[in-house]
């Protein structure tokens, strides 16, 4: 291998894929004068539901909002427990706390980073009301096993699909005729992005109606159109709700991204293939495994170092990549080690040893549809140069 040459410019960890179509779509909305929740939001709800194969879609301003609404529709609250994973972003656990319930963590499968169904079963008590599995990095959680557990114990299933646009379980998109609810993120870094945004999908009419009302102050259905010719100024507040709705500027971006999904995914997978080939036979690195039931959407490229084979730590490895002008991230710092949860529940790192070990060795490499093969090759070479420099 020739000597590694550091590029002069910084390579961002993630960048949104913005074409002229997105610019034009938002310009059209801005010129229309209808910027808030309106016809474009309604169109997106219809098209996204059709895309994933669900009966209902409620477009909201974040996946956090969707996760919160999912629990609210079930009346989950104080005294209840909800099982989830410690290897996730804070919103998964925070929304459980926001309804007054207690998040109960179950450890992961270290090969995938996904919540382990066997660990879920160990955590079930008489207070357990729901399970919130996370489709981590674009891998599908084992919905067959988790669904059976939920059926056996009469538990609500709220899927956190923040990473899972284009993820498939047994050939079907996540969200296809869901057992309970599925919550998505359209944050700027996601496979489908609109800056900030999210969606809740369900096949349940009652859940959909309640979530729709709660997402916009508790206003009665149709209130979004109260300024239109066919609308009515009269509305009711059915129950105190939240300001969670998506608006048309976001929806226009989301619709355009949805129409470009196939091409964006194709280019994302070209970069993944570079990484997979480069790291396949490197004993200092551990690649994420994909279960047979799953089609990985590749929201993240998850790489783990093998600490005992290197003379530097994961944190030092990241600094070495930064010195080579490669931006990376970590997904995630295990929640049970965060002060908000450790202090409240008395957690220690070793309470969830697999999640902790995963968290302490993981590095997320740059991955986005505009990355390109050449840039992916540079990232791979940078990683291999660090390994070569610091292997034992």
Predicted regions and their residues:
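N-terminal "arm"/small-domain region of PLP-dependent enzymes with the aminotransferase-like
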Residues: 1-34, 39, 236-238, 366
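Phosphate-binding glycine-rich loop
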Residues: 34-81, 95-99, 105-107, 172
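PLP-dependent aminotransferase class I/II
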Residues: 42-46, 54-57, 118, 130-134, ...
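Structural detector of well-ordered beta-strand residues that form the stable sheet scaffold
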Residues: 58, 83, 104, 156-158, ...
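PLP-dependent aminotransferase-like
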Residues: 72-164, 168
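A short alpha/beta connector and helix-capping loop motif
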Residues: 114-123, 171-181, 383-385
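Conserved active-site segment immediately N-terminal to the catalytic lysine
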Residues: 159-194, 233-238
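Active-site PLP attachment segment
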Residues: 177-221, 248
């Amino acid at each position: 291998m020739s000597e590694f040459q550091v590029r002069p410019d910084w390579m961002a960890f993630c960048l949104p894929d913005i074409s002229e179509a997105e610019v034009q779509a938002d310009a059209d909305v801005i010129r229309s004068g209808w910027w808030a929740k309106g016809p474009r939001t309604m169109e997106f709800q219809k098209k996204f539901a059709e895309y994933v194969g669900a009966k209902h879609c409620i477009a909201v301003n974040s996946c956090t909002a969707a996760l919160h609404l999912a629990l609210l529709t079930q009346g989950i609250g104080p005294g209840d427990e909800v099982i989830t994973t410690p290897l996730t972003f804070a919103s998964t656990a925070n929304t459980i706390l926001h309804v007054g319930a207690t998040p109960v963590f179950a450890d992961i499968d270290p090969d995938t980073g996904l919540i382990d169904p066997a660990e879920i079963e160990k955590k079930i008590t008489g207070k357990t009301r729901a399970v919130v599995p996370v489709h981590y990095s674009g891998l599908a959680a084992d919905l067959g096993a988790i669904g059976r557990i939920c059926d056996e114990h009469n538990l609500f299933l709220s899927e956190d699909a923040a990473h899972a646009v284009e993820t498939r379980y047994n050939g079907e998109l996540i969200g296809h005729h869901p057992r309970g609810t599925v919550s998505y993120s359209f944050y700027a870094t996601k496979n489908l992005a609109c800056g900030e945004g999210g969606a809740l999908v369900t096949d349940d009419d009652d859940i959909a109606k309640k979530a729709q009302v709660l997402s916009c102050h508790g206003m009665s259905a149709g209130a979004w159109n109260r300024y239109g010719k066919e609308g009515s100024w009269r509305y009711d507040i059915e129950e105190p709700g939240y300001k969670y709705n998506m608006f048309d500027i976001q929806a226009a971006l989301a619709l355009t991204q949805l129409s470009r999904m196939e091409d964006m995914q194709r280019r994302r997978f070209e970069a993944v293939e570079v990484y997979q080939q480069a790291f396949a036979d490197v004993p200092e690195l551990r690649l994420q495994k994909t279960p047979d039931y799953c089609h990985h959407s590749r929201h993240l490229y998850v790489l783990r170092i093998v600490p005992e084979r290197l003379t530097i730590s994961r944190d030092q490895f990241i600094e070495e990549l930064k010195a080579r002008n490669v931006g990376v991230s970590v997904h995630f710092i295990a929640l049970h080690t965060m002060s908000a949860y450790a202090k409240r529940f008395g957690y220690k790192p070793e309470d969830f040893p697999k999640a902790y070990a995963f968290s302490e060795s993981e590095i997320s490499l740059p991955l986005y549809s505009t990355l390109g093969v050449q840039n992916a090759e540079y990232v791979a070479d940078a990683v291999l140069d660090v390994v070569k420099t610091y292997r034992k």
